[in-house]
Amino acid sequence: MNRIGMITTIITTTITTGNGAG
């Protein structure tokens, strides 16, 4: 569960950064 949460956070951060940059 902890690993899933970390992966979700990384994916969310990546998407947010991509949208912000794009």
Swiss-Prot record:
By which gene is this protein encoded? thrL
Function, please?
Answer: This protein is involved in control of the biosynthesis of threonine.
**Similarity comment: family membership:** Belongs to the thr operon leader peptide family.
Organism, per UniProt?
Klebsiella pneumoniae subsp. pneumoniae (strain ATCC 700721 / MGH 78578)
- Coiled-coil intervals: none
Which superkingdom is the protein from? Bacteria
Q: What is this protein called?
A: thr operon leader peptide
Please give the InterPro entries that the UniProt record associates with this protein.
Thr_lead_pept
GO BP term, example:
threonine biosynthetic process
Which keywords does this Swiss-Prot/TrEMBL entry list?
A: Amino-acid biosynthesis, Leader peptide, Threonine biosynthesis
Q: Tell me which Pfam families the record gives.
A: Leader_Thr
